[in-house]
């Protein structure tokens, strides 16, 4: 499946305590994207998305808005070859 890609994403702003991770998980599952999401100690959210190029790029775009109560300031994404993540989970 050569059309699969991986995006490693860092989201800054008011993104913790606003259901950002849960909304990310739910949206990724709706789009059949594999990966994970977690809060970082510095206040950012880190996520990995794997799936078809179009779906992953769409998910990275979604991160700019995120959950309804979030206030996203920046989204940094790096693309790479997929590592074979299966399913989508919230990591703690």
Curated annotation (Swiss-Prot):
<dbReference type="InterPro" id="IPR020456">
    <property type="entry name" value="Acylphosphatase"/>
</dbReference>
<protein>
    <recommendedName>
        <fullName>Acylphosphatase</fullName>
        <ecNumber>3.6.1.7</ecNumber>
    </recommendedName>
</protein>
<keyword id="KW-0378">Hydrolase</keyword>
<feature type="active site">
    <location>
        <position position="39"/>
    </location>
</feature>
<feature type="active site">
    <location>
        <position position="21"/>
    </location>
</feature>
<feature type="domain" description="Acylphosphatase-like">
    <location>
        <begin position="6"/>
        <end position="92"/>
    </location>
</feature>
<dbReference type="InterPro" id="IPR017968">
    <property type="entry name" value="Acylphosphatase_CS"/>
</dbReference>
<dbReference type="Pfam" id="PF00708">
    <property type="entry name" value="Acylphosphatase"/>
</dbReference>
<dbReference type="InterPro" id="IPR036046">
    <property type="entry name" value="Acylphosphatase-like_dom_sf"/>
</dbReference>
<dbReference type="GO" id="GO:0003998">
    <property type="term" value="F:acylphosphatase activity"/>
</dbReference>
<comment type="similarity">
    <text>Belongs to the acylphosphatase family.</text>
</comment>
<dbReference type="InterPro" id="IPR001792">
    <property type="entry name" value="Acylphosphatase-like_dom"/>
</dbReference>
